[in-house]
Amino acid sequence: ALEYCDYVETDVRITADNNLILFHDPDLNERFIKELTTEEILSQLDNVKKDELILSSRDQIKGKVNFEIKTDSLLQPQIDILFQKMLPILHPEDIVTSFNWKSIQDFKELFSCRYGIILDHEDALFEAKSLSIHDEDMFFMVERTLLDSRHFDLPLNRTVIWTVNEKNDFVHFLDMGAFGVITD
């Protein structure tokens, strides 16, 4: 993948025993990741070693990374632990993003990398526009249909559009001046 892209996007979740793992889905076999210990997760995954599952060092991943921090259904103490554990992992060329705008705002001064918020509905555009004016470093990960909204007015040079799978759209958005696109 690194041959064809500038960044790799991956989801970060926290386990019941407060370990960070790279895992897209919120659950595993109908149990939430946040409720499972690392050992319980390992017992359900074939051929995965503990040191491969737990994200403990930036050295585990090559290239630039967009870490999407998944906080859905977490309590605030777990959210704080998740973000605090991410801080030493982040590399200056990375981007850390989340649907949890509050946590991005709370931790942005501590990040050693770029940071951004994720938008997937039109109502969020107004608040995001306000943030774009007051925070010139913030990036915006925008669901592609929001670009068609008459309310879209975010700085394209700090906008990443998802999910774009057609080559023509990919080229079009980059030609428009978008910072990037996320594709499957």
What are these regions (language model features)?
Residues 1, 11, 41, 67, ...:
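Conserved, mostly hydrophobic/aromatic
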Residues 6, 12-64, 69-72, 117-120, ...:
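An active-site metal/cofactor-coordinating segment within enzyme catalytic domains
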Residues 75-88, 102-119, 125-132:
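Distinct, well-ordered alpha-helical segments
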